[in-house]
Amino acid sequence: MSLYDIIRKPIITEASMAAMDQKKYTFEVDSRAHKLLIKQAVEAVFDVKVASVNTISVKPKSKRVGKYTGTKSGYKKAIVTLTEDSKKIEIFGEDAE
C-alpha cells in the first residue's frame, strides 16, 4: 500500500470546516492504515508537519429504499492536527474564497 493510497478523500462537514481554523483536518482513510502510516502519508502528500492523529472507525449503517434494505459501508476517519509552525492545507485551492 503506497502513501498515496492511504488518504481517500477529505470529509467536508460543518464540524470539520470549523476545525480547520485550529489546523485540524478530517480525512477518510484506508481501514487498514494505522496512525503512524496516516501521519507519514499526510506529511508526504501535503508537505506539512503533523502533531497528532486521531482515528475513528465509523460503523456501517442500514438504509432502506422502499421495501428494500441494504447497508452503507463503514469507513475509517482520521482527524489530523498540524503543528503551529506548519502551513495550512489548501483543500479547495486558492480560488475558493
From Swiss-Prot:
UniProt keywords, alphabetically: Ribonucleoprotein, Ribosomal protein, RNA-binding, rRNA-binding
GO cellular component, one term: ribonucleoprotein complex
GO terms for biological process, alphabetical: translation
Xref: InterPro entries: Nucleotide-bd_a/b_plait_sf (IPR012677), Ribosomal_uL23-like (IPR013025), Ribosomal_uL23/eL15/eS24_sf (IPR012678), Ribosomal_uL23_CS (IPR001014)
Record keyword Glycoprotein present: no
Functional summary from the UniProt entry: One of the early assembly proteins it binds 23S rRNA. One of the proteins that surrounds the polypeptide exit tunnel on the outside of the ribosome. Forms the main docking site for trigger factor binding to the ribosome.
Family: Belongs to the universal ribosomal protein uL23 family.
Assembly, per entry: Part of the 50S ribosomal subunit. Contacts protein L29, and trigger factor when it is bound to the ribosome.
Name recorded for this polypeptide: Large ribosomal subunit protein uL23
Gene name linked to the record: rplW
